[in-house]
From Swiss-Prot:
The modification Phosphotyrosine is found at residue 454. The lineage of its organism: Eukaryota, Metazoa, Chordata, Craniata, Vertebrata. Residues 46-112 form the Importin N-terminal domain. This is Exportin-1. The keyword Cell membrane does not apply. The modification Phosphothreonine is found at residue 448.
Amino acid sequence: MPAIMTMLADHAARQLLDFSQKLDINLLDNVVNCLYHGEGAQQRMAQEVLTHLKEHPDAWTRVDTILEFSQNMNTKYYGLQILENVIKTRWKILPRNQCEGIKKYVVGLIIKTSSDPTCVEKEKVYIGKLNMILVQILKQEWPKHWPTFISDIVGASRTSESLCQNNMVILKLLSEEVFDFSSGQITQVKSKHLKDSMCNEFSQIFQLCQFVMENSQNAPLVHATLETLLRFLNWIPLGYIFETKLISTLIYKFLNVPMFRNVSLKCLTEIAGVSVSQYEEQFVTLFTLTMMQLKQMLPLNTNIRLAYSNGKDDEQNFIQNLSLFLCTFLKEHDQLIEKRLNLRETLMEALHYMLLVSEVEETEIFKICLEYWNHLAAELYRESPFSTSASPLLSGSQHFDVPPRRQLYLPMLFKVRLLMVSRMAKPEEVLVVENDQGEVVREFMKDTDSINLYKNMRETLVYLTHLDYVDTERIMTEKLHNQVNGTEWSWKNLNTLCWAIGSISGAMHEEDEKRFLVTVIKDLLGLCEQKRGKDNKAIIASNIMYIVGQYPRFLRAHWKFLKTVVNKLFEFMHETHDGVQDMACDTFIKIAQKCRRHFVQVQVGEVMPFIDEILNNINTIICDLQPQQVHTFYEAVGYMIGAQTDQTVQEHLIEKYMLLPNQVWDSIIQQATKNVDILKDPETVKQLGSILKTNVRACKAVGHPFVIQLGRIYLDMLNVYKCLSENISAAIQANGEMVTKQPLIRSMRTVKRETLKLISGWVSRSNDPQMVAENFVPPLLDAVLIDYQRNVPAAREPEVLSTMAIIVNKLGGHITAEIPQIFDAVFECTLNMINKDFEEYPEHRTNFFLLLQAVNSHCFPAFLAIPPTQFKLVLDSIIWAFKHTMRNVADTGLQILFTLLQNVAQEEAAAQSFYQTYFCDILQHIFSVVTDTSHTAGLTMHASILAYMFNLVEEGKISTSLNPGNPVNNQIFLQEYVANLLKSAFPHLQDAQVKLFVTGLFSLNQDIPAFKEHLRDFLVQIKEFAGEDTSDLFLEEREIALRQADEEKHKRQMSVPGIFNPHEIPEEMCD
């Protein structure tokens, strides 16, 4: 069967690609059908045939036949793809008469298809694609080869309403292509010319839009015109907006017509966002007229929340657009309206609408409103941060030190506070949630959207609290009271209230905070006793834990309360409801970090530090926790121990702290000494992994002083490492590499990994590099390096590489002497694992380059000490890195290269031979990634490296000849070398283009943003064949701009004494 398929495909391909005979349209339709409706091999064959045909340089000559005779819409779309391809890439090399022919054909086809209203509706997608083709032609032809385009399209629009409607779409697409999407699609100079042409000829387009809006009764045409106008508003000269009847037409004629209200409101929003001072009156008019219309369309007493939930799509869109309009206008022009006393009421009405819209149960709309409330609260606070925040309404007498703007917004801010408290989003720390089925469960996936919403709401509520903390407290206390008495009790209400209470930590005066919090925690603890049922208790517990975790200042100041809270957390650690134990451990660690010192001091009324109580009862506290929760608990206690400053006391605490894990560890080591096979027992290996994880977390918290515990287990741990390595190797030899997937082998590898994590974690926190280098590094290298080298690739631990990287980063010069030994063991064998492709061993890949980066940054002399063959491998691997498809690896590769180049420049002895051997090579490889579209993300770094390299040559830092065979001035050589390199890679470029590009590489090498845009322009040019006519590349203009840039650079340099060699200074300046 596959053989027959191949024959058929070959036959189809031969027939379709034979341009000497007529196109068999039925055959083409069949192949296209195969692509869309076939499966497997059949589909792949069709894809191959169509790709071959599309890439054929003469394929475009078949497009008219395809569009005219094909019965299949997909085939027509395929024909348009061919046409688009030729316009974008080969237009400049087509003879003029053929360009004119294609242009006439496309215009004719659009006129024919769009003149018939029924056809327009039926073939919407097809016409849309034809329009896009025309716009691609315009980007090549207009204004030079088609100066009359704007008057042509405006003239044609007056002949037929249906045609006019489609022409509006074409103008809208052209505007988008030139003003919104031009970056990276057309060169900067060409983009500027197209923008200038659009602005210069806009009056004709504007008159057409005005004519339609004033005279047409054709609703779809008017709608299309408004949509097009919307796209123009962000770039047209402002006179067209503010010195014509446009604003009043939009408001009076279209805003209250259901079909046009959404697009009209979007237009008004776009205008509202303009920031200029000379049109103040027009903005006031815009605001007052829009508000008048709004009150007719949507009376102020409307329940917008209800209207939204019952509304149709376009009604819901209208409410969203309304929020955008109000938010945009008020953020930009609120002070303009505030100044006018006669508009105060209108301003309050606008804020009332904002409040009503803020209550709509739709997150996207709420985010828009929140943006405004945040802006307003922040502005009012920043104007006078230290004004009293007591509420004048509550304190009975008028406070004259409340700033006037604040007074104006006061009544509204009461309502906004209530809104924020009632709608507070879920913070990241809360793990116990109610799911869609109404069950209380542990949340596993973090919702970044919800976290961002929480952060913005938190910030807004903090500002609102600063503006009037009495009111904030009143709202929260009342709402809490209603939870306790049951009138507002629900999980959702309790959650949002507690999340809001937690979010204002630090925004009240300390005394007020204390009074408020004591009430809150007492009420919540009471609620916990009062409510029955595990779910209720879990929700209340999660809220108590969240709030206490947010108020470390309060806890630090009130020891009794802190102790009560921590004991309550220990209670929750026995509560097996989903998520409660996790949250108890997470809250405990937060409190431990923020209040660490209080646990190691003897507090008033206590006989010993609380840490001793914890360590005495540690067994009882953690007996119901899961292993990973125990690890979190150990980390928390570690922060407390880390705060003890008396070394002797601290060492005693560490011994007591690690007693439980050490007992199990010692027992396993003793058994292993008698019978090493115990290290093949699954349960034992699992225990070892868990003990080491505990040590890792403890070390992370205690820091350098953990050395006393590390030293105690260090050599045994490395022996276990070696022993497990041998077990793994033996298993692989006996059963092949698949054995690494088995649970026991995976547990053994966990032990190895955790060993490396413990060592690297401690080294990164240590403070005595010499002691580490002398006592800890030698046994480590002995245990891990040879093992890594000997292992089969699948069994090599990527952590070995990251551990070495951490050691190099931390110890710097202290470890330089060991680098050759480390490299011998890990460099080549890892490189052979990752240089076959870009996918396998992703962790080894990342860590390998992190190690290279560490050596490059901290032990660069070691690079110069390794043999030349190995250094070449290092450089090859850096080049391999920046060509990577994995973004993080490519970025690391570029950073290593840049640092390497800068380091080499400091090494006089090695620099010149390095440049002679590698400079041109590196340049060539950098250009290969610059011109590779899959690497555009790295363009800034490419620009920095290239600019640095060209600058080295220009400033004469490279004294050796880059071309020993024919020694000429390096700058002249480099200009020719790069020009030839680019010409051979892109033979379709004209000499003038290449010459100008190379000139820019020298002129702009001290202005990275300009250098980067210069590269981006070049990337646009290599996509298309330029032909003889390069006028629309505006090379002369670009040349003048580059010359100016060069002169500017020269002037800047002249102003720095000594920057130029005395022989480079012009004669008249020598005197």
